[in-house]
Amino acid sequence: MFGADKGTADRLDGRKLHIGIVQARFNEGITEALAAACREELLALGVQEKNIRHVRVPGALEVPLALQALAEQDEYDALIALGCIIRGETYHFELVANESGAGVTRVSLDTQTPIANAILTTENLEQAVARQTEKGRDAARVAVEMANLLEELS
């Protein structure tokens, strides 16, 4: 598997940031690994443990509502959505993937809060396992970078 060229990131100083994480429990083995990698990377970027709020919801469709509730508290510089949707035999995969993704984007735009979307959508469990650690780290980096960018732009 080849990785995407993500370019060189800057604005990765998380020392002053408050970050909220919303994790879906469905496919919990994968989402726990995403969360662990995400938290580890946030700490490595300087975000203080006390400035990380981590909440869990039943599944990917519930993630946007929890993100909105956190964003409306106006305490977080950025939020992170974690989940895992694995294709099954029915149309449900497309519905959950599309609606959760649209919901995350809507919350971000409506609240002007950066949200790193790491809700994995994979064909099978093996693909999810292959992505769980790096996508968790990526989400942390995206959240920190976008929080700092929005601060610069304001």
From Swiss-Prot:
<feature type="binding site">
    <location>
        <begin position="84"/>
        <end position="86"/>
    </location>
    <ligand>
        <name>5-amino-6-(D-ribitylamino)uracil</name>
    </ligand>
</feature>
<dbReference type="InterPro" id="IPR034964">
    <property type="entry name" value="LS"/>
</dbReference>
<protein>
    <recommendedName>
        <fullName>6,7-dimethyl-8-ribityllumazine synthase</fullName>
        <ecNumber>2.5.1.78</ecNumber>
    </recommendedName>
</protein>
<dbReference type="InterPro" id="IPR036467">
    <property type="entry name" value="LS/RS_sf"/>
</dbReference>
<keyword id="KW-0808">Transferase</keyword>
<feature type="binding site">
    <location>
        <begin position="60"/>
        <end position="62"/>
    </location>
    <ligand>
        <name>5-amino-6-(D-ribitylamino)uracil</name>
    </ligand>
</feature>
<dbReference type="GO" id="GO:0009349">
    <property type="term" value="C:riboflavin synthase complex"/>
</dbReference>
<comment type="pathway">
    <text>Cofactor biosynthesis; riboflavin biosynthesis; riboflavin from 2-hydroxy-3-oxobutyl phosphate and 5-amino-6-(D-ribitylamino)uracil: step 1/2.</text>
</comment>
<dbReference type="Pfam" id="PF00885">
    <property type="entry name" value="DMRL_synthase"/>
</dbReference>
<feature type="binding site">
    <location>
        <position position="117"/>
    </location>
    <ligand>
        <name>5-amino-6-(D-ribitylamino)uracil</name>
    </ligand>
</feature>
<feature type="binding site">
    <location>
        <position position="131"/>
    </location>
    <ligand>
        <name>(2S)-2-hydroxy-3-oxobutyl phosphate</name>
    </ligand>
</feature>
<comment type="similarity">
    <text>Belongs to the DMRL synthase family.</text>
</comment>
<dbReference type="InterPro" id="IPR002180">
    <property type="entry name" value="LS/RS"/>
</dbReference>
<dbReference type="GO" id="GO:0009231">
    <property type="term" value="P:riboflavin biosynthetic process"/>
</dbReference>
<feature type="active site" description="Proton donor">
    <location>
        <position position="92"/>
    </location>
</feature>
<feature type="binding site">
    <location>
        <begin position="89"/>
        <end position="90"/>
    </location>
    <ligand>
        <name>(2S)-2-hydroxy-3-oxobutyl phosphate</name>
    </ligand>
</feature>
<dbReference type="GO" id="GO:0000906">
    <property type="term" value="F:6,7-dimethyl-8-ribityllumazine synthase activity"/>
</dbReference>
<comment type="function">
    <text>Catalyzes the formation of 6,7-dimethyl-8-ribityllumazine by condensation of 5-amino-6-(D-ribitylamino)uracil with 3,4-dihydroxy-2-butanone 4-phosphate. This is the penultimate step in the biosynthesis of riboflavin.</text>
</comment>
<feature type="binding site">
    <location>
        <position position="26"/>
    </location>
    <ligand>
        <name>5-amino-6-(D-ribitylamino)uracil</name>
    </ligand>
</feature>
<keyword id="KW-0686">Riboflavin biosynthesis</keyword>
<dbReference type="GO" id="GO:0005829">
    <property type="term" value="C:cytosol"/>
</dbReference>
